[in-house]
Swiss-Prot record:
Gene3D superfamilies noted in UniProt: NDT80 DNA-binding domain
Subcellular location: Nucleus
Chain segments carrying region Disordered: 64-172, 283-310, 477-504
This protein's encoding gene: NDT80
Gene Ontology molecular function: DNA-binding transcription activator activity; DNA-binding transcription factor activity; sequence-specific DNA binding
Coiled-coil ranges from the UniProt annotation: none
Organism phylogeny: Eukaryota, Fungi, Dikarya, Ascomycota, Saccharomycotina
Matching PROSITE patterns: NDT80
Domain of life: Eukaryota
Induction field: Induced during biofilm formation.
GO cellular component, one term: nucleus
Biased composition (Low complexity): 73-87, 103-145, 153-172, 292-301
Gene Ontology terms: biological process: cellular response to copper ion; cellular response to lithium ion; cellular response to N-acetyl-D-glucosamine; cellular response to oxidative stress; filamentous growth; filamentous growth of a population of unicellular organisms in response to biotic stimulus; filamentous growth of a population of unicellular organisms in response to chemical stimulus; filamentous growth of a population of unicellular organisms in response to pH
The protein, known as: Transcription factor NDT80
Function comment: Meiosis-specific transcription factor that binds to the middle sporulation element (MSE) of targeted genes corresponding to the consensus sequence 5'-ACACAAA-3'. Acts as an activator of CDR1 induction by antifungal drugs. Modulates azole sensitivity by controlling the expression of ergosterol biosynthesis genes. Required for hyphal growth in response to different filament-inducing cues and for the proper expression of genes characterizing the filamentous transcriptional program including noteworthy genes encoding cell wall components, such as HWP1, ECE1, RBT4, and ALS3.
Length: 504
């Protein structure tokens, strides 16, 4: 064999691995280009992915193109590949030099990343340069596993936090709308006129104050009348303990009277009288009239009333009546009451009536509450037995002749006599002006008066004030409850104005 032939054969043998390696690299480059063209998203997809997931590497977007939910797993796989790559590079370092780019599990894998920019330039999509890529993926090997675990945990926590934040924001938005609707509803909500929520027991009244004495005709013994009254609607206690009402609101008051040591049977079996020193018409009787002062028994020295009522006129009481009046603490201010009809329209308005009444106990608050606005005839009849005395039924029950009756019952003007005076749908004609400078001590009071109805010489009825009770000071406001931020009541509705936060 020729020596040169041996040399050529040796050269052929020496170059054969390099030719095979170049052929293998060419195939790998061709497959990588095809693989990159298939796996690389178009510019619109890359832009969308970068906007949605800016924290991902550009290679992660390739995986996101086909499997959007696998980018956390891909990061873990990349870290495993980096560890394997370092081992292979250490083993084959004397054969194949390692490029600065990211290495794969085989020595030929670095050529993939070297050839990636060429197909990407075909799409004209901007990609990060290899230098930042190498900087991003060349941390210290000792800290690499902890960063990978931390990044994975941060990605998972970020997704959970984003989902929870969106759900919480949606829930808070719904709660805000619901609270706003509740505030608007509460600020505009009105209680129905017949609603039981309007009824609440008002302030207590004082003890009875007697203005004129009352005597029994048969014994000339003094009789002590006792008044009872209660406000069942329209007033409530404010935050400072004052009793507050509103001019536009109705209030309801019930009143009755009793005679001490006199039951009802004893009452209707007697007559009563009093003395009058004010009514000039009564004192103007002619000398022959029984009511003239010289014909009065109390003017005789032996009469038990001589020392107290000498010179006064003794007048018989035809019947008793109950009246409701309002007064102001300022005597120069006139205040009155009006009563509305049950139709709640701008119909006729009258002053509260004077109720002829017989002695009776005051019903409780629940009875008054139930008795309002009844429409059932049976229930109305039941309530009438509580609030009224029927004189005609009484005569029939005891077989009495109304013409021969000499009791006080005969003097009452009608068959139906009130046992309890019900003052319903009552309003004040004026209110207390809060902005006035002299209103600090101004207030209103309600007075329930027991009247003795007498007749003068012209047979005209005249009232004589026998006894009275009064309420504690009442504040009557002219505007809605929400207009008064101090001393609030239950009708107060807070405005939407936010309260300033105190400085820290």
């Amino acid at each position: 064999m020729h020596p040169s032939a041996g040399v050529n054969n040796n050269q052929h043998l020496n170059h054969q691995p390099y030719q095979q390696m170049s052929h293998y690299n060419a195939q790998q480059m061709h497959q990588q280009q095809l693989h990159h063209q298939l796996m690389t998203p178009n510019p619109y997809q890359q832009h969308f992915q970068q906007q949605m997931h800016p924290q991902l590497h550009h290679e992660d977007h390739l995986n996101m193109h086909f499997n959007p939910m696998s980018y956390p797993q891909q990061q873990q796989q990349q870290q495993q590949q980096q560890q394997q790559q370092q081992q292979h590079l250490h083993h084959f370092g004397h054969q194949i030099p390692a490029p600065p780019a990211q290495q794969g599990p085989t020595p030929q894998q670095p050529h993939l990343h070297q050839q990636i920019p060429h197909p990407l330039s075909h799409h004209q999509t901007p990609q990060p340069t290899p230098q930042p890529l190498a900087q991003q993926q060349s941390p210290q090997p000792a800290r690499q596993p902890r960063q990978t675990k931390k990044q994975k945990q941060q990605a998972q926590n970020q997704d959970q936090a984003d989902a929870q934040s969106q759900a919480q924001q949606h829930h808070m938005a719904m709660m805000a709308r619901a609270n706003q609707n509740d505030m608007l509803e509460s600020s505009t909500r009105k209680v129905a006129p017949r609603s039981s929520d309007l009824f609440r027991v008002g302030p207590p009244f004082s003890i009875s104050k007697q203005h004129q004495p009352v005597y029994c005709v048969g014994t000339d013994m003094p009789v002590t009348p006792l008044l009872h009254a209660r406000i069942d609607r329209g007033f409530e206690m404010g935050e400072t303990g004052s009793w507050i009402g509103y001019k536009r609101n109705y209030f309801t008051l019930v009143a009755s009277f009793t005679l001490q040591d006199f039951d009802f049977e004893k009452f209707i079996g007697n007559k009563f009288y009093t003395y009058d020193k004010v009514n000039n018409k009564v004192n103007g009787f002619p000398p022959h009239h029984p009511s003239h002062p010289q014909n009065q028994p109390q003017n005789h020295p032996g009469h038990p009333h001589h020392n107290q009522h000498a010179g006064e006129s003794r007048v018989p009481i035809s019947y008793f009546a109950i009246r409701l009046v309002a007064k102001c603490s300022d005597e120069d201010v006139a205040i009155s009451l009006i009563q509305h009809t049950a139709k709640r329209d701008k119909g006729p308005q009258f002053p509260p009536p004077i109720y002829p009444a017989v002695p009776s106990e005051l019903p409780d608050h629940e009875t008054v509450k139930v008795s309002c606005n009844k429409r059932n005839n049976n229930k109305i009849e039941t309530m009438n037995k509580i609030f009224y005395f029927d004189r005609g039924n009484y005569y029939q029950e005891y077989n009495l002749d109304s013409y021969k009756d000499q009791s006080i019952l005969k003097s009452y003007p009608s068959q139906s006599i009130s046992k309890v005076a019900r003052f319903e749908r009552i309003q004040f004609t004026s209110s207390i002006r809060v902005k006035s400078t002299n209103t600090t001590a101004r207030y209103f009071t309600l007075h329930v008066e027991l009247l003795g109805i007498i007749e003068d010489e012209d047979l005209q009825i005249q009232p004589i004030l026998l006894s009275s009770i009064e309420s504690p000071p009442l504040i009557v406001r002219g505007r809605s409850p929400s207009s008064y931020h101090k001393d609030r009541t239950s009708g107060y509705r807070a405005t939407n104005t936010p309260t300033p936060t105190p400085p820290q």
